[in-house]
Amino acid sequence: MQITTRAYQPEDFAACARIEAGAVRANHYFADVVDYYRSTAGELTVACVDGVPVGMGKLTVLFDGSTWLELLRVHPDFQRKGVGRAIYRRYFEEIRALGCPAARMYTGVSNKASAGLAEQFGLKRRAQFHSMCIPTENLRCRTDIKPLPRIGAEQALAFLPQLNKQTGGFLCINHTFYHLSETTLRGFAAMGWLWGDEDTLLIAGARFQPQKALYLTMADSGENQKEKLSRALNHAAALAALSGAEQLVIHFDPNDSKIHDFCLENGFVDDPVDDVVMEWAEESADTNR
């Protein structure tokens, strides 16, 4: 059995769709994102056994030059046979070629197989996140609350202490966990994902599938915190209504009871499984197999 890896080609579409259907029971989104993935920096990789596609994975270069490892899928007939390792080797060949200082991925807190594969290549557990969601139809947009203006990175930087405490150093959009930094906030500003004023910050956006969900982070400063968070949530509800997003999704540190309680009071529902972000960084990497 010969395992090889190469860049995705348009003629691989049907095979990759079958790989996704076999590898995961739900949340099939390859068809929606393949064109987007091919337009972003970083390779969409196909793994083949004896020339036949049986796995795939995407490496994406983010705003700060780090890489995000996503869409790792292996057909069940070929799992635990070295296909995932081959995709990771391809990832790290590209990481070295691009000179990227860090690589990250996420998995479910109980997904030992995914975490174990990442650990073989030097990724280490970095942070854990709890998520909650609410259908847009359950949101209420109040007309008596003043909307938030769009802001730039400079204004958002004032909220760094609160964001670090709330997010563990990462901002989540479409289950992509961006390292919290000035460079990342400038990238978010360029995407139009930042809203706020001197007391309230809302980060809201979607990398892809904007009709599926709008991903948000909320932060506040000073007194009347619940009032400020309510203003941010109201603005997010309006954005979701305008974009046609089916739901709002929020990720935060599992120990942040303030955000958790606020979301519960406003109709959000807990997701059953927390997410774990894993990271490889140049200065701490032990193996690049």
Report residues per predicted region.
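Conserved catalytic-core motifs of GNAT/GCN5-like acyltransferases
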Residues: V61, R104-T107, K124-N138, V269-A281
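Conserved active-site alpha-helix within GNAT-family acetyltransferase domains
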Residues: R85, V109-A127, P254-D271
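Conserved acetyl-CoA-binding loop-helix of GNAT-fold acetyltransferases
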Residues: V74, R80-E94, G116, Q120, ...
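Conserved GNAT acetyl-CoA-binding A-motif
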Residues: E94-S110, L242-D253
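A conserved beta-turn-beta hairpin within the catalytic core of GNAT-like acetyltransferases
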Residues: V61-L69, Q79, A206-M218, D270-D274
